[in-house]
């Protein structure tokens, strides 16, 4: 339930549940999660102002989590040239391969292109490697085959994104690896929980980081994960896109809807508990202007464009234009690529997909490919980076400013990297901290150092707009 609570999809669900009670009466609602930082608020999201009981199991899991910073070795030089990868990344790959010898391993990465980059280079390094790549842009059949092979033990390691973070039973997992920072403690806790999936078993995880800031952020998150300091779920307050979506959907389904029924039902949904009659009137007026509904007295009915919107916007998941990718040798669909990436392709180009290299044969309604040997271009997918909580960024910055590594679950090598990083910044001048924003000036570049987490992205956009007009 934590995945829904803070999103527009969750707000859509909350109104939909209230609409369902009009048809079926009140019913039992059960929300499951292992990583809720604010159980009381999330329970309110699920049931509104109804009575609710929060059940927390008394059994605590044993967790073994450590941050590693594998050091490049001289033997990696040839591999660096062969794989076209930085020494630190090659060292991380080598460590991951060695660690996975412990048993069935899930190697989590944060993006689909990182999964592909790791998968194809692992296969180039070791063609007999027992690995599969798993992410949401691969076809359903490919993902199911990967899960089945892992369950049966014919594949030892799955390189995966959040596609395997929740819900799916992949059987026994001895070790969870996380490549670079997991970005927040709730996500790391969820991923770590995939290992040791039996009562009294220890969940074992290792975060493999490749550079200083990743090591620092990973160490802070690992500490928070082990101490149970999970980020609070922030419920979106009255997202208007959701409100418009549900009003249009409702009028399409019920033809005529009483305005008071709209108001009373929507207010019962927790994200819209502060919803007012004035809010409703403003939204109905807006939808009327764009021909999505018509208000006649106290009733609201669908507008001339409502049906088209309804069928094109059932979900609030952003709709990205994609095309299928088919293996010409087997005629099987292996996944989907964003059209923006496909526009730059021509027959003969090499691309990386499913951890392997493919040559583009034909581009029509779908992309036809055949297996290839040489390294190709990584696909580009439109998506959002996983946000970094403000509290994580603040703690990381304060520890760096103080040179304080106490209580961080990291190896000696990782600690040495952090200490060296702290000393190099101190030698350069002013140390950035939560109280001190610093600016680095390079030849054609300014870097603002401020520990705002993902909030810094908003600040960057505002500064860019003020300075450059975009």
Which ranges hold each PLM region?
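Helicase motor core with emphasis on the C-terminal RecA-like subdomain
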Residues: 1-254, 260-296
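Conserved small/polar residues in nucleotide/adenosyl-binding loops
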Residues: 460-467
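Phosphate-interacting basic helix/loop segments used at nucleotide- and nucleic-acid interfaces
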Residues: 92-93, 151, 157, 161, ...
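Terminal, basic amphipathic appendages of nucleotide-handling enzymes
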Residues: 227, 239, 320, 363-438, ...
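Generic beta-strand/beta-sheet core signal
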Residues: 32, 108-110, 160-161, 171, ...
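Conserved nucleotide-binding/hydrolysis modules and their immediate coupling elements
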Residues: 289, 295-392
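Active-site phosphate/pyrophosphate-binding segments
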Residues: 242-243, 247, 253-278, 417-448, ...
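Long, charged amphipathic helices and adjacent flexible linkers at domain junctions
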Residues: 233, 307-309, 425, 432
